[in-house]
Amino acid sequence: MKFFIFTCLVAAALAKHAVKDKPSSEESASVYLGKYKQGNSVFFQTPQDSASSSSSEESSEEISEKIEQSEEQKVNLNQQKKSKQFSQDSSFPQICTPYQQQSSVNQRPQPNAIYDVPSQESTSTSVEEILKKIIDIVKYFQYQQLTNPHFPQAVHPQIRVSSWAPSKDYTFPTARYMA
């Protein structure tokens, strides 16, 4: 279900992006309204042909509606291609019922075959095992943080030293005491 919602959101975002890049509907209708001439397997449109299009059998409104519908179909096809390509490139887990998974493995139907359908108990035990593993991992990381601190535990205050007033209890650390 999440995958379906995600693909819908991606398709909506792509549609908004395509609408921004697309010229206005009046410009696109005026571009496609003319008759197309064929010459040497190349189609082209001339401004004179677009002016004489009013004498055609269909009105310009019907032509523009057909053009808009065809453009919408092209946009929809492009969006579908992009969403299919995105879904193939990404590695989302496929959500299937157990019967669908089994039928994809066994191509030929076997009337006497017994399918391995996981029961509710087996899925609940697997969830419990996963939770135990997660708890163990969390405990391990907490132990790591306690035994190997990343920051010093105690910060000792530093004594301010002034070069103007020498300290009275100044001693050399290498001097030996004479007794």
From Swiss-Prot:
InterPro entries the UniProt entry points to: Alpha-s2_casein, Casein_CS
Chain positions found as Phosphoserine: S24, S25
Signal peptide: 1-15
Main location: secreted
Protein task: Important role in the capacity of milk to transport calcium phosphate.
Annotated family: Belongs to the alpha-casein family.
Keywords for the protein's UniProt record, in alphabetical order: Milk protein, Phosphoprotein, Secreted, Signal
Listed name of the protein: Alpha-S2-casein-like A
Compartments where found: Secreted
Native source organism of the sequence: Rattus norvegicus
UniProt biased composition (Polar residues): 93-110
Basic and acidic residues bias spans: 63-74
Organism ancestry: Eukaryota, Metazoa, Chordata, Craniata, Vertebrata
Molecular function GO terms recorded: protein homodimerization activity; zymogen binding
Gene Ontology terms: cellular component: extracellular space
UniProt region (Disordered), positions on chain: 44-121
Tissues expressing this chain: Mammary gland specific. Secreted in milk.
